[in-house]
Amino acid sequence: MNRPERLQPGVKLRDADKVARIPVKIVPSERETMLRKPDWLRVKLPASNQRILEIKAALRKNGLHSVCEEASCPNLSECFNHGTATFMILGAICTRRCPFCDVAHGRPLKPDAEEPVKLAQTIRDMKLKYVVITSVDRDDLRDGGAQHFADCIREIRKLNPDIKIETLVPDFRGRIDAALDILSAEPPDVFNHNLETAPAHYRKARPGANYQWSLDLLKRFKERHPHIPTKSGLMMGLGETNEEIAEVLRDLRSHNVEMLTLGQYLQPSKFHLPVVRYVPPAEFDELKVLADELGFTHAACGPMVRSSYHADLQAQGKEVK
């Protein structure tokens, strides 16, 4: 059996090169076998893209990344056009290789020590009031990147004292307590970590992750910061049943998670996990009713919902679909 070639630092692996390195074989989808997108998933482009160009220019100027671009989010046009963005720190190369995700895999470069300051300056220049900070997985770092998160939060608040910050963190595999110790010095206004799918689908969708570890991360943060909302998100359409999703919602509530996002999985390329089905809006509505009954303070459920989609409105408790 041939061993994978040694990864070179800074080289991005995408599509076939990326998924070739996971234990579950992904068969490239043929066009005739791919499900046709239903009408409710048609993305409307904005009338003006000027704001989008301005935000992209600001990101390029400071060498920053947005998960909106790196993960090929379908809501990029809408969010950018409304002057919001989710910033991705710690580079654009992930040490994991989840086959649902379009972010590149490889050996990341060392963290940019100037990134926290550049990020804070960019947010000030963009006059944002609510930001989401996320990252690639950095299993190569002793703290999983926790200190860099804390540094970014601190610098952002120095230049933007009235801002609200949501963090969408990785699972800090094997380093949960150490990471939370570090983050306790600079806690966010909302703490988000996505479970992504039901536990039965972790082996194919989240190689290297563990369902219970992710639940424990959310619960332990909440135990340390009982007044800070915790949040998690799930994709639908990977082959899970609605009852499996319902059970995940119950698990989240039993681990004191208060905010929820449910959205439709979209296949980034033929080399990624295929869409098993497109979930009708009515089923998202039914799960929204269940989430409310379970006691989530806010649940955004709909085909186009993503974890950071209109995150400011989610934090305010306003309906997002």
Swiss-Prot record:
An annotated Gene Ontology molecular function: 4 iron, 4 sulfur cluster binding
Primary subcellular site in the record, as a coarse category: cytoplasm
Residues binding [4Fe-4S] cluster 1, per UniProt: C68, C73, C79, S308
Family annotation (Pfam families): Radical_SAM
Keyword Transferase in record: yes
Species whose genome carries this gene: Shewanella denitrificans (strain OS217 / ATCC BAA-1090 / DSM 15013)
Record pathway: Protein modification; protein lipoylation via endogenous pathway; protein N(6)-(lipoyl)lysine from octanoyl-[acyl-carrier-protein]: step 2/2
Residues where [4Fe-4S] cluster 2 binds: C94, C98, C101
Necessary cofactors: [4Fe-4S] cluster
EC code: 2.8.1.8
Cofactor remark: Binds 2 [4Fe-4S] clusters per subunit. One cluster is coordinated with 3 cysteines and an exchangeable S-adenosyl-L-methionine.
PANTHER family: LIPOYL SYNTHASE, LIPOYL SYNTHASE, MITOCHONDRIAL
Protein name according to UniProt: Lipoyl synthase
Reaction equations catalysed: [[Fe-S] cluster scaffold protein carrying a second [4Fe-4S](2+) cluster] + N(6)-octanoyl-L-lysyl-[protein] + 2 oxidized [2Fe-2S]-[ferredoxin] + 2 S-adenosyl-L-methionine + 4 H(+) = [[Fe-S] cluster scaffold protein] + N(6)-[(R)-dihydrolipoyl]-L-lysyl-[protein] + 4 Fe(3+) + 2 hydrogen sulfide + 2 5'-deoxyadenosine + 2 L-methionine + 2 reduced [2Fe-2S]-[ferredoxin]
Domain Radical SAM core residues, every copy: 80-297
HAMAP family named in the record: Lipoyl_synth (MF_00206)
SMART domains to which the protein is assigned, alphabetical: Elp3 (SM00729)
